[in-house]
Every structure is written in structure tokens, then in C-alpha cells.
Amino acid sequence: MAELNKSWILRQRPVGDLKEGDLELVEGPLEPLKDGEVRTRLIYLSLDPTNRIWMSDVDGYLPPVGIGDAMRGGGLAEVVESKFDGLKPGDIVNTGLATWSLYSNLPGEALNALPRLPGVPLTAYMGPLGATGMTAYFGLMDIAKPKAGETVVVSAAAGAVGSMVGQIAKIQGCRVVGIAGSDEKCKWLTETAGFDAAINYKSENVGAALDEHCPDGIDINFENVGGKIMDQVIARLNDFSRMPLCGLISTYNATEPVPGPYSFSNLLMRRTLLKGFIVIDYFPRFPEGIQQMAQWLMAGKIKFETDIVHGLENAPGSLSRLFEGKNLGKLMVQVSEPPEA
């Protein structure tokens, strides 16, 4: 019997939180492989806040996923068949913008076989050596340009991006304060990731805690969340501060217009540099970022956690973990067994 593909199809635009019926898991035959293509088997599927944006009919940095189309997403996959000279079966690739599918036919020229570094697990290519690591690296180093002695605040600090941002800032000699949603996460940030302080926004007064941990004000705010927490940080920014705007996860499931930051005028008074960015803007520079992150990772200067859910069928139900703050580190779905190193 011929092997079947499995794909999550977008059936309707979600309103608010993702619910049953918005996506449907379907089976179907494998598409014929064309010259120049490779067939990949998905190993790890990345779950990211941007997945929710792509489901909505909004004017984003990419067109929304069409109704009836396979859900867009990326991950790590193994080449199982190749009609492209540069890749062979057994190679591991980062799929880029593929789909939530067990098998995909992808253009070989857009892919590169990942090097296997000694002592580095494959999951590192979903974290510090993947898109989340590149988001942290370029957002901080290229936009914020941290200097030793500066104070850096990171929201969603125990997430895949935030945890990398804080550790890179520490390597640069900064004081780093993270904001997260549980005592467990705050403990990990200070005891494992090396943050100077961590604030549990669910149990602490964020403004008072920022005053305590940032007595000299805030030089860099790496923003992942938005909303009321962002307001508290903006109100404490220093002159000529920098604010890479990476995400606004608190707003992605909103069903009504979201009010703007009440402390917005402080960006003017403090002459803050505020810049939104998308990691794909930096794609041509990924080799530079991966090389540096790999050096830090292999030197033990970067720690990372993975939150792994098993089974492609569990992908939609697991996406909510991001918006509920339940994940520690990089959230992903293991779709199939990874090959032995």
C-alpha cells in the first residue's frame, strides 16, 4: 500500500483563540517529485506566535494562509528522495516556509544540508541555531547594539527568543532583567540562563519590580509581548534607549481593537529608537549569526530548553501553550523519529 501524506488544512479563519474546526488533518497521496525538488519527511515542526498571524486575514509581512490550503510552518526534515544534485537521502534540512505536513516536496536550491556539530543535538537547529536564535541575535546585536554596563529588559524571557536574547546580552556585559509568567521560569532564568533578575508578572507588581531591579533605568527593551507590561517598561526607558520590536504576542488572539501604549509619549521624550523587524529580513546574514551562536553554544555560554509535543495530530492544540505562557524554551512538535547522529 502506498504511503500517504498527512497535512493540517486551514478550514476557516479563527476568531480569538484557535478552536476545533479551524484546522482539519487530512490524508492524501504523495505528490510526484519534479526535477530540482527533494521530498522531505518532517522530524520537528516549529510552533511560533506567527502561526496564529498567518491564519488571520490581516495585512502582514506575508499573505495569510488561504482557506483550504495547508497550514504554513517550518521545521527540520530529512530528505527521503531527491531529484536535486546538491542533496541526497539522509540529509537534514531546515524546511524554511513549508507546511504542517508529514511529507513536502521542496525546491532543492532553497535548502542546505545542516552540519552536525559534535555534542550539539539536532534540536539546537530549532533553537539557538535556528530562526529563533537568529531572531534573538540580529534583533539584539544589529538593532539594539548593546554596550557593556547597560541594562536590558526582555519580555517573554523564558521563551525561545527571549531566553537567547538575555544570554547574548550577558555575553556582551549587560545587566539583564527578564519578565516571565511563573516562579519556575524565573528560577530557570536566574539559575541556569544567568539573568541578573527575573520578574513574575503574574504574582509581582511589574512596575515596582522594574524600579527595584533597574535602578538606573532601562537602556534596551527587547519587546516580545506588548500590552500593559510593555507600558511599564517604556515608562522607565533611558535617554537614547533602543527597543527592538520582535513580537506582540498578547494581542494576536484579540477579538477587539487593542489600545496603544499609554506611555507612548515617553519614546519621544527619551529619544528611543523603536524598530520592528522580522527575522526573514536577515536571511542573507544567517551564516554569520549561526557561526557566532554555534561558538557560544559549544563554549557553554548559551543554554537552551525545548518543549516537545509528540505527534503531528497534536500541533493545533499545542499552539495555545505559547499564548498561555506554558512553554519553557522552544516549543516544537516531534512528527517522526530523528535519525541517529
Where are these predicted regions, by residue range?
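Mid-domain Rossmann-like dinucleotide-binding core that forms the NAD(H)/NADP(H) cofactor-binding site
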Residues: 126-204
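C-terminal capping/lid region of NAD(P)-dependent oxidoreductase domains
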Residues: 2-5, 301-308, 316-341
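NAD(P)H dinucleotide-binding glycine-rich loop of Rossmann-like/cofactor-binding domains
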Residues: 71-78, 89-156
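Glycine-rich phosphate-binding loop and adjacent beta-alpha segment
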Residues: 228-302, 335-341
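Short amphipathic alpha-helix with an adjacent loop that forms part of the alpha/beta core around
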Residues: 205-215
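N-terminal Rossmann-like NAD(P) cofactor-binding module of classical short-chain dehydrogenase/reductase
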Residues: 94, 153, 199, 221-222
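Glycine-rich beta-strand-centered segment in the early N-terminal region that forms part
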Residues: 29-47, 55-99
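Short, glycine/polar-rich helix-capping loops at beta-to-alpha or helix-loop-helix junctions
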Residues: 101-102, 181-188, 206, 258-264
